Amino acid sequence: MCLYARMEETAEIKISITIYMSIRQFRSIVKEVERYLGHNDTTDADELYRAGKHYLGSKFRGVYPRDKLPKLKNDQCMIINLDTSKQAGSHWIAIYCAGNSYVVYDSFGRKIGSILPSLTFDGSGKKIITSPDYDAEQKRYETNCGMQSLGWLIFVYEYGIHKALKI
């Protein structure tokens, strides 16, 4: 094996280890949120708001249905439900404002256009970014999307957005 191939292989191993460690850290944060809320099941807006303020303080704007989204400033975040304010609620996703971009996290790993094709925040023209992996952290039978979303936001503030995009 030539030196270049070994260097490439070593770099791939380091990246794999980094991703593995990030996922472990993320899961640990989600478990902490579950302990704080006292369960690992479906969450309502009040529970998520209380936990979001507890962990993230003023950086956490709140919990909203998709038709009532506020403006976010740089380094602020929120959790939104895919349903409108007139519906019961179906699935929570997280939004983080990074400069001129909104970063969207979906625990099912779907492309944002497929779950929320008309997502608009404030007419600011900010770019919408999702994780390029489209990998799911939540299994179909699990109902903890709110905790996963909050866990991802906590991870963003603890480890940085670049690491969070690898989850």
Predicted regions and their residues:
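Contiguous terminal or domain-adjacent regions
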Residues: 152-167
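Cysteine protease catalytic domains with a Cys-His-Asp triad
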Residues: 2, 11, 17-93, 98-102
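Cysteine protease-like catalytic core of ubiquitin/ubiquitin-like
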Residues: 74-156
